[in-house]
Amino acid sequence: MEETEKKVATQEGRFFSKMKVFLMSLTCAYLAKSLSGVYMNSMLTQIERQFGIPTSVVGFITGSFEIGNLLLIVFVSYFGRKLHRPIIIGVGCVVMGLGCFLMASPHFLMGRYKYETTISPTSNLSSNSFLCIENRTQTLKPTQDPTECVKEIKSLMWIYVLIGNTMRGIGETPIMPLGISYIEDFAKSENSPLYIGILEMGKIVGPIIGLLLGSFFARVYVDIGSVNTDDLTITPTDTRWVGAWWIGFLVCAGVNILTSIPFFFFPKTLPKKELQDNVDVTKYEKVEKHRERAKKENLGITKDFLPFMKSLCCNPIYMLFSLTSVLQINGFASTFTFLPKYLEQQYGKSTSEAVFLIGVYSLPPVCLGYLISGFIMKKFKITVKKAAYIAFGLSLSEYFIFLCNYLLTCDNFPVAGLTTSYKGVQHPLYGEKNVLADCNTRCSCLTDTWDPVCGDNGLAYMSACLAGCEKSVGTGTNMVFQNCSCIGSSGNSSAVLGLCKKGPECDNKLQYFLIKSVFSSFIFSLAAIPGYMVLLRCVKSEEKSIGVGLHAFFIRLLAGIPAPVYFGALIDRTCLHWGTLKCGQPGACRMYDINRFRHIYLGLPAAVRGSSFLPAVFILILMRKFHFPGDIHSPDTELAEMKLTEKESECTDVCRSPKVENDGELKTKL
């Protein structure tokens, strides 16, 4: 008897050891994948400037991750549990690491980054061609030499980033469903929620680290170590600045590959914990039979795929909920993807500052909201109908808070000839042909080069030449231009490099915007779990696996992939001045019409999300006609539920993993 107890204790210790190591490994994988995804989103502006591509192409690169997910989601959902799950997870981590490395590779293939400028960074001679000189020919034109134009093909290197991001999507697909199903199958049932909660912590810590990395590397110049940064004439707030985006992807690649190593040493199966608590043979056989029935039911799902699909498509609540989710995610995905760009253009912040502010003000409220929401749902045993009303009310409240962003706006940067007249008067927006004025027509300036300077009159000019400056002193970012005829009639009017900063009133509005973001993020996270509860309860038990997978498929196909593309294309239409490549072709946008940008950035998500409340209202109406588990409390009902407990538990074991595998779909796009 004592030997048996010792044997059981030894087996139990081994089980705990293996399960704990697997849990720790899976948590690290969660952290690595969320770290990579959030870092990617934080570096979109840097990638846009590095390759000189429009925002619509950046949106396509973002959507390529969802494309990679779609390529394997069906295979993983229905056949992944038959294979060696830990090894598949390990391979997925390796693929993610290789994808991140591929995304960083263009930096080593393209050579040094050269931003458009007319200024010689080391010269302080007043005879430099970037100054106002009368009666000269324009020699500083975009290069039309065929050899130089061939070199510009390097801008197509963004395709490497596209393919790498697709690989990241492919590699991430098996981690969540197979990892959670492995825990659900071999961990003690009462410990599963704790283990899943630990995994969620990995998903929370990853984005925080990703945003901190993004904020740090956005401040580091892209060619750090290869150029003398003291000679640069741009700063991190300049729209031509490109941070060291590639270093972060190398970090992500290393982290993902390191996290893959433990998974190759785990067995295909572990002994079920319940069996070690009791060595009774009868119970062992009973559990084994139960497991066999679960496997048969799981295989039946694939055989009954078409009937289940037909049943789901004929389920009005399910289809309306999917429509609501698609509309909501269209708005959220677009807003979050281009939030750093909005903060840069609207409030004059650098990419580094914008990413840091997002991490500080958005993520902590989301984490707190998930914890409080989960506690309330469990503590008060909220029914599915009440959950639907709670989700609707909270979402509507968050929507009205979102609309308040229209009150927290700033004016365009004052740039002579683009947003104001040369006298500083706000005027209907100018075109490129209006950048010339009486004060600079004698200078023979280029009108398409973006090399902004800020005059001491508070007005910015597209270049020192267009400001009428005749002299310069200093080098690098400390260069000062003097005798600028467009700035003032006095001989000592001057200008410095860069756009003029926005006033303190704009900084105050940014603070209000961030405070509002705290409440908005918190309320949204409160609504996510009740909403997801509606999804799980509106379908039959045997349809939950396909139902959750199909719901995720709808979101990726109709929101995750197209939303960044069409949203980016609309943002491109608000550009006031495009950068210029060597062959004279347009590059990345240097300045936007912030008023039109704001209408697109805030108006389109407001319209899309506003329309989502219409199908949500129909869901509430339809739910009154149906009865869901927990809605009716009576002794007869409780007795009937007790008798059906064993039957329902079999279905639950089959469907439990798919319930959780897409738990993040409605929560956040971080």
From Swiss-Prot:
Chief location bin: membrane
A GO cellular-component term linked to this record: basolateral plasma membrane
Site (Essential for pH-sensitivity of estrone 3-sulfate transport): residue numbering on this chain: 107
Localization (cell): Basolateral cell membrane
GO molecular function: organic anion transmembrane transporter activity
Disulfide linkage: 439-469, 445-465, 454-486
Tissue: Highly expressed in liver, and at lower levels in kidney. Not detected in other tissues.
Residues on Cytoplasmic side: 1-20, 81-86, 185-203, 268-311, 378-381, 537-545, 624-670
Annotated ranges, domain Kazal-like: 433-488
GO biological process terms, semicolon-separated: gene expression; monoatomic ion transport; organic anion transport; response to stilbenoid; response to testosterone; response to xenobiotic stimulus; xenobiotic metabolic process; xenobiotic transport
Topological domain spans for side Extracellular: 41-59, 112-155, 225-242, 334-353, 406-513, 572-605
Cross-referenced InterPro entries: Kazal_dom, Kazal_dom_sf, MFS_dom, MFS_trans_sf, OATP
Catalysed reactions listed for this entry: estrone 3-sulfate(out) + hydrogencarbonate(in) = estrone 3-sulfate(in) + hydrogencarbonate(out); taurocholate(out) + hydrogencarbonate(in) = taurocholate(in) + hydrogencarbonate(out); L-thyroxine(out) = L-thyroxine(in); prostaglandin E2(out) = prostaglandin E2(in)
Domain of life: Eukaryota
Family matches, as Pfam families: Kazal_2 (PF07648), OATP (PF03137)
Keywords: Cell membrane, Disulfide bond, Glycoprotein, Ion transport, Membrane, Phosphoprotein, Transmembrane, Transmembrane helix, Transport
Glycan attachment sites: 124, 135, 483, 492
Entry-linked Gene3D superfamilies: MFS general substrate transporter like domains (1.20.1250.20)
Topological category with respect to the lipid bilayer: Multi-pass membrane protein
Residue numbers of Phosphoserine PTMs: 634
Subunit structure: Binds to PDZK1. Interaction with PDZK1 is required for expression on hepatocyte surface.
NCBIfam families linked to this entry: oat
Family recorded in the similarity comment: Belongs to the organo anion transporter (TC 2.A.60) family.
Role of this protein: Mediates the Na(+)-independent transport of organic anions such as steroid sulfate conjugates (dehydroepiandrosterone sulfate (DHEAS), 17-beta-glucuronosyl estradiol, estrone-3-sulfate), conjugated (taurocholate) and unconjugated (cholate) bile acids, prostaglandin E2 (PGE2) and L-thyroxine T4. Also capable of transporting sulfobromophthalein (BSP), ouabain and gadoxetate. Hydrogencarbonate/HCO3(-) acts as the probable counteranion that exchanges for organic anions.
Protein name (Swiss-Prot/TrEMBL): Solute carrier organic anion transporter family member 1A1
Species for this entry: Mus musculus
Gene it is expressed from: Slco1a1
